[in-house]
Amino acid sequence: MTLQQQIIKALGAKPQINAEEEIRRSVDFLKSYLQTYPFIKSLVLGISGGQDSTLAGKLCQMAINELRQETGNESLQFIAVRLPYGVQADEQDCQDAIAFIQPDRVLTVNIKGAVLASEQALREAGIELSDFVRGNEKARERMKAQYSIAGMTSGVVVGTDHAAEAITGFFTKYGDGGTDINPLYRLNKRQGKQLLAALGCPEHLYKKAPTADLEDDRPSLPDEVALGVTYDNIDDYLEGKNLPEQVARTIENWYLKTEHKRRPPITVFDDFWKK
């Protein structure tokens, strides 16, 4: 088995999908989890205005709507959380995503004050954060807020990780990568677009250039620039297609060096890191 085949298998990726079937699969997955653990009353998700959180948010609200109708349990809710750092440049996209999702509840937590306070505390301890590490601080502050909300609403935190993100480890460890349940896991980027199109999402929310937008020195830096490969390259790789050797090597190098991000903390029983 080639490394490409191993990666495809590990991430559960498929070369082709039926959008309606995958929508149903994710919604049923969320519903089943909530029914298995009836003490869970809420799904909590940060909404950025990008493709992934828009899709995950819509699926969460669909699952909650169906469960309430089927069980009569009105205590169930989906909580969409806006987590800007100061003023977000694409705030209108966030509002458009909220309008599309129609969440039960919307909370806004501006993380800038908390991030600056943390940065100052570290500075006083003799640690000056680089712009890149400050970006990770933002991602972790966002996740901290979501877990606080989940803790106070008997909830779980929903993630947006999918195959095209997992393969490169393009997430912050214990930031946006630290979640309870990931309904998009298995899909590549273009497949996520297919689901949103089938759901009637406004096109500009999934046709915009994806960006983590964590760095102050490089605001709205496109993911594809940071990664050195395009999402079309990554999707083609996950669909088992042949790519130029250098492109495939770049993707595989990302996968291998970020393996620790896709695993629990390393113990004496692990040996994957010895490769």
Swiss-Prot record:
InterPro entries reported for this sequence: NAD/GMP_synthase, NAD_synthase, NH(3)-dep_NAD(+)_synth, Rossmann-like_a/b/a_fold
Q: What GO biological process term is on the record, naming one? A: NAD biosynthetic process
Claim: S-adenosyl-L-methionine is one of the keywords in the record: no
A GO molecular-function term, please? Answer: NAD+ synthase (glutamine-hydrolyzing) activity
Q: Where does ATP bind?
A: 46-53, 160, 189, 211
Catalyses which reaction(s) = deamido-NAD(+) + NH4(+) + ATP = AMP + diphosphate + NAD(+) + H(+)
CDD domains in UniProt? NAD_synthase
What's the superkingdom here? Bacteria
A cellular-component GO term for this protein: cytoplasm
Look up keyword Nucleotide-binding and say if it applies. yes
* First-level EC class: ligase
Binding-site residues for Mg(2+), renumbered to this chain:
52, 165
Task: From the UniProt record, give the pathway where this protein acts.
Answer: Cofactor biosynthesis; NAD(+) biosynthesis; NAD(+) from deamido-NAD(+) (ammonia route): step 1/1
SUPFAM superfamilies the UniProt entry points to: Adenine nucleotide alpha hydrolases-like (SSF52402)
Give the protein's biological function.
Catalyzes the ATP-dependent amidation of deamido-NAD to form NAD. Uses ammonia as a nitrogen source.
Quaternary structure, per UniProt, is: Homodimer.
Identification of the protein by name? NH(3)-dependent NAD(+) synthetase
